[in-house]
Amino acid sequence: MPEGEMMHKLQDIIDRKLLDSRRIFFSEPVTEKSAAEAIKKLWYLELTSPGQPIVFVINSPGGSVDAGFAVWDQIKMISSPVTTVVTGLAASMGSVLSLCAAPGRRFATPHARIMIHQPSIGGTITGQATDLDIHAREILKTKARIIDVYVEATGQSREVIEKAIDRDMWMSANEAMEFGLLDGILFSFNDL
């Protein structure tokens, strides 16, 4: 068996074992493709054992807001309680995903980092003034949605969150817990 084929088969075995233990690892940027994979896994677990807990482990630099909110909405729709665990990094939309679990179910590993900020538009935007105005209004609506998530999750005031996300705000796991983004630090997955 060629080495590449063997590694692919090994990855399939690992993925199967993780799904059997009701763990989903989201270890990549938030894209339409990564969101679709996460949603498929969530629904597979929901359909095979509705209401049974799921652990959603996040290590993501962030990415697409729309793709991230697609995952968020699915987690909120299923009956299975989801626990989020940040390991490594949850930045930007990754930090928003870490908050989709119910209060008391949001954790990080000791050396995890979380970064929150306001949304941005990448690349160059060109077009008519009215089109640019439409884009500007849309990003402000997106910013308001993200602020709402942080306010609800942390219990902080809207003013505190607006100030916090004005620029990139980096936090250790302990700092994120003090800010209200996390409910605890995990030293062992046996603690779940």
UniProtKB/Swiss-Prot annotation:
Signal peptide: none annotated. It is found in: Cytoplasm. SUPFAM superfamilies: ClpP/crotonase. The keyword Hydrolase applies. It comes from the Bacteria. It is an enzyme of class 3 (hydrolase). CDD domains: S14_ClpP_2. One of its GO terms (molecular function) is ATP-dependent peptidase activity. One of its GO terms (biological process) is protein quality control for misfolded or incompletely synthesized proteins. Its EC number is 3.4.21.92. The active site is at S92, H117. GO terms for cellular component: cytoplasm; endopeptidase Clp complex. It holds the Pfam family CLP_protease. It catalyses: Hydrolysis of proteins to small peptides in the presence of ATP and magnesium. alpha-casein is the usual test substrate. In the absence of ATP, only oligopeptides shorter than five residues are hydrolyzed (such as succinyl-Leu-Tyr-|-NHMec, and Leu-Tyr-Leu-|-Tyr-Trp, in which cleavage of the -Tyr-|-Leu- and -Tyr-|-Trp bonds also occurs). Keywords: Cytoplasm, Hydrolase, Protease, Serine protease. PROSITE patterns: CLP_PROTEASE_HIS. InterPro entries: ClpP, ClpP/crotonase-like_dom_sf, ClpP/TepA, ClpP_His_AS. Belongs to the peptidase S14 family. Cleaves peptides in various proteins in a process that requires ATP hydrolysis. Has a chymotrypsin-like activity. Plays a major role in the degradation of misfolded proteins. Fourteen ClpP subunits assemble into 2 heptameric rings which stack back to back to give a disk-like structure with a central cavity, resembling the structure of eukaryotic proteasomes. This is ATP-dependent Clp protease proteolytic subunit 1. It comes from Chlamydia muridarum (strain MoPn / Nigg). The gene is clpP1.
